[in-house]
């Protein structure tokens, strides 16, 4: 019995740490975009469909906004699966547009880091935020709402 309780706590803590790690990485990238200049116009033609049809300025602001907003949702564990899925789409577009042709090596701007981010985001998509989250609290407050199982 004690082992099961400790396992639940460990799982909650590890998912919390994972959420904080991903939030930091994506928020930092969002801040770089916030403080930098839009370079998406230079690579717009490399974006996959349908993102290549969207103007570079809009893509820039959507990417920046996603990298600034979704990390906060991850930290608090609110709409975690949706946030992780959205960030997975974002990093997949980045992988396809920037990193895919550069090989695996991080030093060559390769796809190693995007791959790590996708794998860790998949954990949150499949497992959710864990016990130490507002998603879990919301499910406890509203146990009869069947749609909350997707949180």
UniProtKB/Swiss-Prot annotation:
Transmembrane segments annotated in the record for this chain: 8-28, 60-80, 82-102, 113-133
What is the organism field in this record?
A: Haemophilus influenzae (strain ATCC 51907 / DSM 11121 / KW20 / Rd)
Q: What is this protein called?
A: Uncharacterized protein HI_1602
Protein's membrane topology? Multi-pass membrane protein
Supply the Pfam families for this chain.
Answer: DoxX (PF07681)
Entry's PANTHER family?
DOXX FAMILY PROTEIN, OXIDOREDUCTASE CATD-RELATED
Q: Which GO terms describe its cellular component?
A: plasma membrane
Keywords in alphabetical order, please.
Cell membrane, Membrane, Transmembrane, Transmembrane helix
**Keyword Cell membrane on entry:** yes
Domain of life according to the entry: Bacteria
Lyase as UniProt keyword: no
Family of the protein in this entry: Belongs to the DoxX family.
As for subcellular location, the record says:
Cell membrane
Cite the InterPro entries for this sequence.
Answer: DoxX (IPR032808), DoxX-like_oxidoreductase (IPR051907)
